Amino acid sequence: MRGTLAQLIASMPGSQLTADASFDKVTTDSRTANAGALFVALRGEIHDAHGFLAQVAANGAAAVVVERLPEGWTLPAIVVPNTLTALGQIANQWRREYAIPLIGVTGSNGKTTVKEMIAAILAAAFGEEARLATQGNLNNEIGVPLTL
């Protein structure tokens, strides 16, 4: 995903933009938040990614999406009420940019297997570059937005 923070802010009610910046990928992993990356600081049960913001800045990330800014923070940021919700809003906005077919697989059992079968069929019919599928079992509120 590529874009600017100014483009994202419209789809994020209650958010505040500190400064605009361009980015060429979105990540929630501070270890991959390097040059050009937009880092979304998620709070988990064990770790709060807000604690890794200094590492993200040192790695050269372009900007961050956070729930709170550290004192003296200078990197461009979008401050939001909830970063997990914001990640979904970013993916939703990105998805709306493209009028391409989408296949969703739901159910209690077998989703990953069916997803892999569909991906293999599409790759055989149209080529690897013509399809996109989640890597492994990322069918959750974090994995799906990151796949888009």
Show the residue positions of the predicted features.
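Phosphate-binding loop of NTP-binding sites
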Residues: 87-148
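N-terminal leader/targeting and accessory segments in enzymes
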Residues: 1-89, 93
